[in-house]
């Protein structure tokens, strides 16, 4: 059985759906019981489990053969790094008590770095933990999610501009669509794996916040501009979004790491480089259509 941790997220839902479309036996691990019915209707088995609760996780993974792991951002926790380490301990222990033969997991650009990455440190910890398992694993270090601009699109549609943490606005970053991440993960889960592999995944090009504004200007048929958020306002901005102080601090450090060039792909021998097919324009157009936004937004 193919089990997907994080099936309700952008990437996890794509992974589970693609596996189901192949006629494979899929289990979606969820925290929210209200989302169970939609997966059951698609033909998936559903298990309710909390990554901070070993017993529920071990029960859910008992009959799993192949596992996809994507951990939650933990923005609501007072100690995101410490609590995430507990999640990783539970995952590793549950895997060792199961019949799991291989794992595909989602890491991030910068996942090889121990310092200066803020929230990405959680994924460094994940890489280190899962590499200790005596079964094959493959990690996907994904670039900046194009979906991170979801709220920016809404703001641009209504106000004609959006705020960006990317500073300067013309800074080019490796970006990738969740669609391409999920597709790669589903393919890897169906392969025979050996050892501990690492893949660095980006889109067909690098993009900036100014590129986002240009794409949205074309799609909305009006001028869209970008306003850069000063770094000294990062933490307060994230706290306004509802993050805990600790989570806001981590996100601020992460953004500064991107902006100063510290967070990057490792790009060394032995690490596979793969490029997704979805362009920024295609991703933005899809998001607008999905949200039923008016292309001629005022």
Regions found by a protein language model. Give the residues of each.
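Aromatic "clamp/platform" in nucleotide-sugar-dependent glycosyltransferases that forms part
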Residues: 83-88
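Terminal hydrophobic/aromatic helix or amphipathic segment near a protein terminus
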Residues: 216-261, 297
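Amphipathic terminal alpha-helices
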Residues: 266-298
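Oxidoreductase cofactor-interface core, primarily capturing Rossmann-like NAD(P)-dependent enzymes
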Residues: 2-27, 31-38, 52-54, 62, ...
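Short, conserved active-site loop motifs that form the nucleotide-linked donor/cofactor pocket
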Residues: 43-44, 137
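Short glycine-centered helix-capping/turn motifs at secondary-structure transition points
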Residues: 160, 261-265
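Conserved Rossmann-fold cofactor-binding substructure of NAD(P)-dependent oxidoreductases
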Residues: 45-65
């Amino acid at each position: 059985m193919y089990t997907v941790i994080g099936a309700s997220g952008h990437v996890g839902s794509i992974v589970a759906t693609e596996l189901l479309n192949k006629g494979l036996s899929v289990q979606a691990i969820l925290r929210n019981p209200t989302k169970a019915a939609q997966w059951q209707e698609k033909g998936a088995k559903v298990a309710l489990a909390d990554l901070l609760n070993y017993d529920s996780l071990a029960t859910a993974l008992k009959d799993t053969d192949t596992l996809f792991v994507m951990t939650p951002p933990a923005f609501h926790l007072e100690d995101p790094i410490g609590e995430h380490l507990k999640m990783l301990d539970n995952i590793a222990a549950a895997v060792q008590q199961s019949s799991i033969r291989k794992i595909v997991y989602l890491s991030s650009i910068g996942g090889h770095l121990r310092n200066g990455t803020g929230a990405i440190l959680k994924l460094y910890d994940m890489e280190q933990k899962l590499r200790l398992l005596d079964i094959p694993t493959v990690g996907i270090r994904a670039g900046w999610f194009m979906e991170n601009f979801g709220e920016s699109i809404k703001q641009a549609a209504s106000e004609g501009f959006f705020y960006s943490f990317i500073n300067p606005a013309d800074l080019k970053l490796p970006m990738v669509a969740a669609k391409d991440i999920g597709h790669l993960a589903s393919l890897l889960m169906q392969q025979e794996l050996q050892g501990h592999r690492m893949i660095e995944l980006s889109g067909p090009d690098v993009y900036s916040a100014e590129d986002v504004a240009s794409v949205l200007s074309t799609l909305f048929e009006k001028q869209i501009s970008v306003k850069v958020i000063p770094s000294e306002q990062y933490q307060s901005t994230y706290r306004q979004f509802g993050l805990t102080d600790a989570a806001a601090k981590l996100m601020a450090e992460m953004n500064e790491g991107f902006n100063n060039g510290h967070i990057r792909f490792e790009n060394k021998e032995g690490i596979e480089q793969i490029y997704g097919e979805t362009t920024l324009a295609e991703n933005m157009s899809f998001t607008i259509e999905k949200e039923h936004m008016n292309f001629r937004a005022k």
